[in-house]
């Protein structure tokens, strides 16, 4: 009697494909100009702020996320973000959180006919609210590459965002030249931004600096992102109008500590003083003169 044994065996190779995070999905450094809103970073690295934020002139740039897939099998693979939405938490002392969703991947399908590394770009939408304080926000989204033959590979891609405080400015003291006694000649009175004191720079015989009311420099308090610099813009001239008629011009505006730039301290606070020159005409009418001037600060 002959017994025939048939032995069957499968010979295969374990899939050694890899999926690695190469570049964070970064929403950059943003300054909210609204209480809430969304910002989109595309898979091409373009940003759409929707008018809800401005991009800070310094700090982290925005860019799309990248993962690298290195296959060892010739196959068709599907790419997706396994998380529909994630929460980024503020790692700074301010607290708060933001949400990131609407993840996009490019390419979303891979037909591997030649082995080699493939980079996959990741985009998404970040939504902030009034409770999203300044600071650095971090989290991660899970990216998957899968096929029926190879199974599923996944990697956690870091997602980052930095929010700065928006700038706020308040006038605490008005720019005031005090009381001036004038004669028939023209003169120019300068108000020093640092000291708030007046001096006659032209036509000294035509004006007396009365001590009845103290002059004051314009004083402003600025609040913003700690340890940053802001630009300062002062007007070239403004016109004051008298209650009995007549006008006078203010020009040569100057700021202290600077007319062009201001550094905010570790608490985000800064102080700016403003002075100017008052041009008094030869036949200037007496009275009380008032006007407004603008001060602009920007990151």
Model-assigned labels for residue ranges:
Residues 5-14:
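C-terminal segment of classical bacterial N-terminal signal peptides
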Residues 14-80, 111-232, 261-299:
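N-terminal small/polar-rich segments of proteins
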Residues 72-111, 226, 233-259:
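Surface-exposed binding patches on compact interaction domains or structured appendages
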């Amino acid at each position: 009697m002959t017994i025939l044994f048939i032995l069957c065996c499968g010979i295969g190779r374990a899939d050694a494909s890899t999926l690695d995070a190469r570049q964070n999905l970064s929403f950059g450094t943003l300054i909210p100009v609204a209480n809430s809103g969304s910002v989109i970073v595309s898979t091409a690295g373009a940003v759409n702020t929707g008018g809800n934020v401005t991009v800070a002139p310094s700090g982290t740039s925005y860019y799309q996320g990248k993962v690298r897939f290195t296959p060892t099998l010739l196959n068709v693979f599907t790419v997706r973000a396994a998380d529909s939405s994630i929460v980024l938490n503020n790692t700074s002392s301010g607290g708060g959180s933001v949400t990131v969703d609407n993840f996009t991947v490019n390419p979303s399908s891979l037909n591997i006919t030649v082995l080699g590394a493939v980079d996959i770009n990741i985009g998404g939408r970040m939504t902030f609210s009034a409770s999203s304080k300044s600071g650095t926000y971090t989290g991660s989204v899970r990216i998957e590459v899968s096929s029926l033959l190879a199974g599923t590979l996944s990697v956690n891609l870091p997602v980052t965002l930095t929010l700065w405080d928006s700038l706020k400015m308040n006038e605490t003291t008005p720019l005031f030249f005090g009381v001036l006694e004038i004669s028939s000649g023209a003169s120019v009175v300068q108000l020093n931004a640092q000291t708030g004191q007046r001096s006659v720079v032209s036509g000294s015989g035509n004006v007396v600096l009365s001590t009845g009311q103290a002059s004051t420099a314009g004083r402003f308090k600025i609040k913003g992102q700690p340890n940053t610099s802001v630009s300062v813009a002062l007007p070239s001239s403004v016109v004051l109008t008298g209650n009995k008629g007549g006008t006078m011009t203010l020009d040569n505006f100057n700021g202290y500590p600077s007319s062009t730039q201001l550094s905010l301290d570790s608490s985000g606070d800064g102080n700016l003083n403003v002075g100017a020159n008052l041009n008094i005409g030869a036949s200037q009418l007496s009275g009380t003169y008032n006007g407004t001037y603008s001060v602009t600060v920007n990151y």
